[in-house]
């Protein structure tokens, strides 16, 4: 805390470039232009991370202070200083944690990157010790069967909206994938593609069977030449454009809480409930680790086990209903509770 307080009081000295050397903004600019890890991110992730980091530049070091985080010396960037930035987003824990995550990545790169004199760009990674804000949010709302039915009733087979729903639900892929899928991906009843997310760092190619329900909707729908889904100008959707359009379709069906990503969650839950294993879920959804798949199989296993065992809670009551209550001191278990 002493280093943070000292940095707040330190006089400002800005070089002609407009960016203080060895300052927080200086390190971020270096990260954007020199980090292979940053360049390997997909365009959308780069954009989001840049926005998160740049949003810290104009944060005052303290309320009412004339100095800002952009000029904060790296040597004085402490855990406390980073947690101040985190806590300013505390009303939205996901945004607060995204700040910490992005700052960690910058310092992680900075401590490894050496300048011409052999010194690292950043003396340490204080963000590593900054904790995340605990949140009980489960993220995007997972669609219920009733919500899927309402969407289908509003958007009949043959519409772009219904085709979008089918592609999302029956492939289990992200919007960044389904906006790029087209007939060129189809062969012998299967669809083959490389997932868009992570394609630069860890490309994942999937081959999925096309279930009959999806094939029927594709055959009955207006499709573009390069992609199944096209916008009103008959061009492939951008990711953001599709997100906005799908939001409109959900609103038209009265589904204010539903989103495209929520269908991916619903698909994983449905598959797990129907008995899909961790490995099977990883194969469908393209997850490289079992973390997400285990989340869904644990939930499905809990429901199945409870279903098979719940009758045991009533075993004594059922027995006494058939033979009469057992006479014992103090009455039956159910009398006591």
Each PLM stretch: what is its role?
Residues 93, 97-101, 112, 122-175, ...:
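Basic, Lys/Arg- and aromatic-enriched nucleic-acid-binding interface segment
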Residues 199, 232-233, 291, 310-337:
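C-terminal secondary-structure termini that scaffold catalytic or DNA-interacting sites
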Residues 184-190, 256-257, 276-295, 325-332, ...:
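Short, polar N-cap/turn motifs at the start of nucleic acid-interacting alpha helices
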């Amino acid at each position: 805390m002493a280093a943070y307080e000292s940095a707040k009081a330190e006089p400002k000295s800005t070089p002609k470039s407009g960016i203080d050397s060895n300052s927080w903004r200086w390190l971020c600019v270096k990260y954007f232009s020199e980090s292979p890890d940053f360049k390997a991110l997909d365009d959308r992730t780069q954009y989001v991370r840049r926005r998160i980091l740049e949003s810290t530049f104009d944060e005052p070091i303290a309320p009412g202070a004339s100095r800002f985080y952009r000029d904060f010396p790296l040597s004085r960037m402490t855990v406390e200083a980073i947690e101040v930035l985190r806590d300013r987003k505390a009303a939205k824990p996901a945004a607060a944690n995204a700040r910490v995550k992005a700052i960690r990545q910058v310092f992680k790169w900075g401590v490894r990157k050496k300048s011409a004199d052999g010194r690292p760009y950043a003396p340490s990674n204080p963000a590593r010790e900054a904790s995340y804000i605990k949140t009980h949010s489960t993220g995007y709302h997972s669609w219920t069967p009733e919500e899927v039915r309402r969407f289908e009733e509003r958007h009949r087979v043959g519409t772009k909206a219904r085709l979008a729903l089918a592609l999302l639900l029956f492939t289990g892929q992200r919007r960044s994938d389904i906006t790029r899928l087209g007939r060129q991906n189809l062969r012998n009843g299967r669809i083959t593609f490389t997932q868009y997310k992570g394609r630069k760092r860890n490309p994942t190619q999937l081959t999925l069977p096309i279930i009959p329900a999806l094939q029927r909707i594709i055959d009955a729908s207006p499709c573009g030449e390069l992609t199944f889904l096209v916008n009103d100008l008959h061009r492939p959707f951008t990711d953001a454009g599709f997100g906005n359009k799908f939001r409109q379709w959900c609103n038209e069906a009265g589904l204010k809480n539903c989103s495209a990503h929520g269908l991916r969650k619903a698909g994983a839950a449905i598959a797990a409930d129907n008995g899909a294993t961790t490995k099977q879920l990883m194969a469908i959804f393209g997850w490289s680790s079992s973390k997400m798949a285990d989340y869904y199989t644990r939930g499905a296993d809990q429901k199945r086990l409870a279903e098979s065992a719940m009758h045991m809670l009533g075993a004594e009551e059922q027995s006494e209903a058939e033979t009469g209550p057992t006479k014992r001191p103090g009455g039956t278990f159910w009398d006591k509770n």
